Amino acid sequence: MAVVVNKENVDRFIELSKVENLEAVVVAEVTDTERLRMYWRGKEIVNLKRSFLDTNGARQITNVEVKLPGEYPLAVGDINVKEEWINNLKKLNVASQKGLVERFDSTIGGGTVLMPYGGKDAATEQEAMVAKIPVLNGESKEATIMSYGFNPDLGVWSPYHMAYYSIIEAVTKLAAVGGDYRKVRLTLQEYFEKLGKNPERWGKPFAALLGAYQAQMDLGIPAIGGKDSMSGSFGSLDVPPTLVAFAVGVEKAKNIISAELKEVASKLVFLMAERNEDYTLKVEGYKKNLEKLHELILEGKVISASSVKFGGVAEILSKMAFGNKIGVKFSNLTKEELFGLNYGSLVLEVKSDVNVDEEFKGCAYKAIGYTVEDEVIVCEEYDLDLKLNALEEAYEEKLSKVFKIKTTDKNQTVKEVLYNESNIKSPVIKVAKPKVIIPVFPGTNCEYDCERAFRNAVAETETLVFRNYSNDAFVESIKNLEKQIRESQIIMLPGGFSAGDEPDGSGKFISTVFRNERIKDAVMDLLKNRDGLMLGICNGFQALIKLGLVPYGEIVDIEEDMATLTYNEINRHMSSIIQTKVVSKKSPWFSGVELGDIHNVAISHGEGRFVAPEKLLKQLIENGQVATQYVDNKGNIALDMPFNPNGSMLGIEGITSPDGRVLGKMGHSERIGDNLYKNVPGNFDQKIFESGVRYFK
């Protein structure tokens, strides 16, 4: 990163960088010579006038030939609706991408308003990425919305319409979650074949530019950023004309809605974007639709919405139904509406007591049916009676071999064992506001979330960036960490990827630091002599395991027969919301919940599978050291995906030391807050942080 700093502040800036474990050096100076001079090994190699650079190079001229698009090639013919419904879900641009999406941490920062897939079964694809604006203190109420739009088939037919509808699709998606299209700003990313001097090739980005411009003028919203890539050719291969539109907006987090169907007996409405003869939208009607939609979302009358995309209304009805397994009975839709491209149109779930004709008066719409309790999609007109499970299998099939979403079921059950004894005595010395030390190692990325969680629990927090850019910095960090541990009552090891999870396994860097004699002595003094607590989440749990603090309560040498956390059974990173059950009350960290309570918790890890010898597992169960286990939607201990995200033995998610005061767990209990995960039903607050603080009072 290049930063311009006032010359009086250079030394201060470099010192502040060192505090953050960053190297900063002066690489250039701003002068009044109006020339750019660059040196290599003391020799001047560049000397250019600023006025020359300001010209942005020589002016270039080319000929452009725009070909008119031919007959619209994407019309729906005479098809068998039942067969097409299933085949439609198998299309590459319709099929589930869940196995790909789960590879990316969707809850980092603790501000996620909508998970990528919603509903109790996490199966309904969402319209947009929505996250609260991050703040260091307090609770943010504002959320950002980001959506995208692009259809490659349209690009092959007409670059003009492709760019036009990329913007329409992105804006419609943003409106579907509760955003106001009038406040949208756009950024565009283009990608075209190598143009050379061919006028027809130049005509493709030119036409796309005109289409994008028309959409912006029609909607009154500008693109304020973008990126171009003009290298989409390799040998005889060319990319299709591509302009991907990204729409960005803001809205109160409380106003955001999601795509999965919510209630039985809701009304379903098809809000239609009508087209002109040239295949552009009748824009005034489209804008009126979006304004009405925004109004009804704010009034709580529209409770879910999804824009029509590549696979038409048939795609949307299926996907909206998957998340909560709520069925649909529909009618009054043509084959073109079911399977054709109807960008700008939406399917809405409307509360059962809403007068649809009155609310949508003046809009282009159809009342198309209602939701039902049975897990089916039914239409008498087309003799349809499709089971949601069968449709979901078709939806997941296309990419399942490339991006796996399941492992082989073990077909085993685990007997639930609840441990209700507690041997925790309150500390001899009470503390009104206990201090929490949160060391931040290279690769740690959850310190802000953990600090916020403890502050909300009314604790004093101190973050310490562990610096390793030099030997002196390393030694100083050891001394500072020791000092902070001795002044604190709680040690918090947050999640992340310490030292990039290398070499060969996560948490090794943290465990190496904590094996330093000064740190080791301070930790054991805290735990054994001062009745302190320690918590490790995700990467922090991995470090606790490697140290032996869980399950042994001591920093010990690693032996082959010890417990460990290893690679997820699916052999990739997993990010999702799972459910865990509290099965032991031994730890003070769980004093605020009841035995058997089930909570939702965010997980994001590649090495979270708990494994241990059978003898040790038996001891942990008997001693009440197994604190939490993964469970399914019925509350049963889960051994298989998706409920057990990593394949942990006995479904173990969290364990404690023998006395319960050291807790390690994979789930990110700190990633909670108001209006988060609005599309995933359940209780997210395990009260871990307030329980830890209350222990000292």
Predicted regions and their residues:
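Short acidic/polar capping segments at secondary-structure boundaries
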Residues: E8-N9, D32, R275, D353, ...
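Glycine/proline-enriched, intrinsically flexible loops and inter-domain linkers
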Residues: M1-G500, V513-M524, L650, I655-T656, ...
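Amide-donor transfer/coupling interface in amidating biosynthetic enzymes
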Residues: F474-E476, L481, M524-D525, D557-K697
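Short, basic, glycine/proline-bearing loop/turn elements
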Residues: K197, D278, P503-T512, T628-Q629, ...
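Cysteine-nucleophile active-site neighborhood
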Residues: S498-K586
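Short glycine-/acidic-enriched loop or helix-start segments at secondary-structure transitions
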Residues: F13, Y448, E502-D504, L544-L547, ...
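Short, well-ordered, mixed-charge alpha-helical segments that flank or form enzyme active sites
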Residues: E34-R35, S231-S233, K254, Q542-K546, ...
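Active-site glycine-centered loops adjacent to acidic/histidine catalytic or metal-binding residues
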Residues: S307, C538, H668
